């Protein structure tokens, strides 16, 4: 068919004919799958549909006695794409992505905390009630702040993004402080009953830093000596005066001293 190559569409027919002709002794296992789900016959590739970001808000409308749920559509700016990127899959975006980016930009060290990503059924989120920040069976982390902020935006009337962020962040700080106090009290009680603890993470880090600094000092001294030797090789060693020259200089100095007197 001219410039179109339909060999890939006829791959099942080709495999069956090769089996009938005796070129192959076994039918491929994907024969039935290709029969049930044949390749697409459309030769024109359509451009991917650009989806809009829809946000749910609870607002008090003029003339209404109660707040009503309003769905806001955020218009996406259409950017011209190159021909090579025209048919790439559409990027999936959620409202939580912007909230998550803002929180971890302000609290980068929260990413260094260990996290448990294992789920039992994959539907653990159904058991969470984000009307409060702390959830049973889930450790407090940055994702808790993001979900709490999103709940405030969706369920509190006339809630703004900055106000919801401040409320969730204030609750997060209070719970973090409570965890630190509980950890310190538990350590003090254990030490009072005779428990001994090893060095803290800060002390271990300082010790590793000191060891690395000592290794660097040894390396720096050796590098400095090598550079000095290379410089001496280019310039040559300084000349050492002979014994006769040194004696002549000393006699000249002794002769000049009486004249000055």
UniProtKB/Swiss-Prot annotation:
Q: Where is it mostly found?
A: mitochondrion
A GO MF annotation of the entry reads: structural constituent of ribosome
Q: Which InterPro entries match?
A: Ribosomal_mS23_fun
> What is the disulfide pattern of this chain?
none
Q: Where in the cell is it found?
A: Mitochondrion
Q: Which UniProt keywords apply?
A: Mitochondrion, Ribonucleoprotein, Ribosomal protein
Which Gene Ontology cellular component annotation is one that this UniProt entry carries? Answer: mitochondrial small ribosomal subunit
Region feature (Disordered): 228-261
Alphabetical list of Pfam families matching this protein: MRP-S25
Assembly and oligomerization: Component of the mitochondrial small ribosomal subunit.
The record's family statement is:
Belongs to the mitochondrion-specific ribosomal protein mS23 family.
Q: What is this protein called?
A: Small ribosomal subunit protein mS23
Lineage of origin: Eukaryota, Fungi, Dikarya, Ascomycota, Pezizomycotina
